[in-house]
Amino acid sequence: WEIPAGKREKGQSFPACARAELKQETGLTAKSLKEIMVFHPCNAFSNEEQHLYLATGLTRGKDQPDEDEFLNLQKFPLEKAYKMMEKGEITDAKTIITLQWYRLHHK
């Protein structure tokens, strides 16, 4: 399992990319988007940056996945997502970092 994510198009801002991926992969539109962290997943091998955003004020629409995307959308209560992470059922690094950040800042 993983949170919505994607590659930024040339000239696209990071927030615009986050909004587009959220809409494309989940059908959700955020009233507010706040960058919570930038991290480097593999410093020794690349200069890749990942920008994590907290989306709030969500409204539901229809997802619009790319032709080559195969999505299995599932909504989990936060406590269940924490348990899944602790059991090793969530292994995606950006998702784990995001869940840990949220747990740390929203007790």
Please tell me what each predicted stretch does.
Residues W1-I3:
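N-terminal strand-loop-strand
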Residues L104-K107:
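Generic C-terminal helix-cap and adjacent flexible tail
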Residues A5-A93:
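Unchanged
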Residues L99:
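C-terminal boundary of histidine-terminating zinc-finger modules
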